[in-house]
């Protein structure tokens, strides 16, 4: 599966609504889109999520559940660079 970094930028004043929805309904991911890990920016206005899927169109399906609360950027990740001592 390909991995993606998802950058969610929360709309001003929407953080309480985001967490309320998340606690009530979960991530609401469609089948085939897998959450791996996430990190919040220090001020909490952006969330960086590592996800994987073989069908990047699923991001749009997922974002329909959240688009009223922010915007999303999806970045396809490449292979991890290898150091000279790695085989």
Stretches with model-predicted labels:
Residues 1-46, 54-58, 78-87:
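Short S/T/G/P-rich N-terminal loop/turn motif that feeds into the first structured element of a domain
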């Amino acid at each position: 599966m390909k991995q993606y970094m998802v950058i969610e930028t929360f709309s001003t004043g929407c953080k309480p609504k985001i967490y309320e929805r998340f606690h009530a309904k979960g991530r609401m991911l469609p089948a085939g889109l897998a959450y791996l890990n996430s990190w919040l920016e220090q001020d909490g206005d952006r969330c960086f999520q590592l996800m994987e899927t073989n069908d990047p169109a699923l991001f749009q399906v997922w974002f329909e559940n959240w688009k009223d609360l922010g915007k999303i950027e999806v970045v396809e990740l490449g292979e991890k660079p290898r150091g000279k001592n790695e085989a």
